[in-house]
């Protein structure tokens, strides 16, 4: 009986703690007057290698990672940066077609960290390179939680200098990871806009 009461109390405590939204957005800006010449930007597919092996894990609580998180976050970031209007942003289809014409994989170009080559192939002044640490849904029978944790850096393709970077980490109860990612990317770009202007 005492064991059952203990389990009930523990379950309630876990649910109460789990209902809290955790949110953190960090922006770092490293622009100087010579960086004002950056006019065109391309967002590369986010590196989602860290979450690819996490398709489904856990016994009681299942964590399901989205299989195309890298492309989804690149699309979201492209859309939000385009809405900002500060840069001319290449669409993801433009990025893909220019890279395909160069007969190389997008992931390989990003991994090589050859930003000058990316700039020449895409004909852009800067690229946004992102990495995903979490992008999924943790699910129990009576409880679900969306998780998004990623970083992004805007890198000058001529100098190799990081112009700005962002780190976002959010976890919210009963929130789909895609909806949560849209919200987080929008908030991060809004915060970036305030820091830059």
Regions found by a protein language model. Name each.
Residues 1-6:
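Bacterial N-terminal signal peptides that target proteins for export
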Residues 8-16:
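Bacterial N-terminal signal peptides
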Residues 19-96, 192-197:
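A structural "domain/chain start" motif
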Residues 37-42, 85, 123-128, 144-151, ...:
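Envelope-exposed proteins and targeting segments
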Residues 52-53, 99, 137-141:
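Extracytoplasmic/secreted cell-surface and envelope-processing proteins
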Residues 62, 145-151, 155-197:
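Short secondary-structure boundary motifs at beta->alpha junctions and helix caps
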Residues 69, 73, 77, 111-115, ...:
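Stable alpha-helical elements in mature extracytoplasmic
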Residues 84-129, 133-136:
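Short, solvent-exposed, polar/charged sequence segments at loop or secondary-structure edges
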């Amino acid at each position: 009986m005492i064991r059952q009461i203990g389990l009930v109390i523990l379950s309630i405590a876990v649910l109460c703690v789990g209902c809290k939204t955790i949110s953190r957005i960090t922006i770092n800006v490293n622009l100087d007057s010579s960086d004002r010449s950056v006019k065109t930007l391309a967002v590369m597919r986010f590196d989602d290698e860290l979450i690819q092996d996490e398709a489904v894990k856990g016994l009681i609580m299942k964590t399901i990672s989205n299989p195309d998180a890298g492309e989804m976050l690149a699309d979201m970031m492209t859309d939000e940066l385009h809405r900002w209007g500060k840069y001319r942003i290449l669409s993801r289809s433009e990025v893909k077609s220019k890279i395909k014409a160069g007969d190389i994989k997008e992931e390989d170009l990003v991994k090589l960290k050859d930003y000058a080559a990316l700039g020449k192939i895409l004909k852009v002044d800067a690229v946004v390179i992102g990495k995903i640490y979490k992008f999924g849904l943790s699910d129990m029978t009576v409880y679900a939680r969306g998780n998004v944790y990623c970083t992004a850096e805007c890198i000058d393709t001529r100098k190799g200098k990081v112009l700005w970077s962002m780190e976002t980490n959010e976890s919210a109860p009963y929130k789909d990871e895609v909806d949560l990612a849209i919200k987080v990317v929008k908030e991060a770009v809004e915060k970036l806009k305030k820091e830059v202007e």
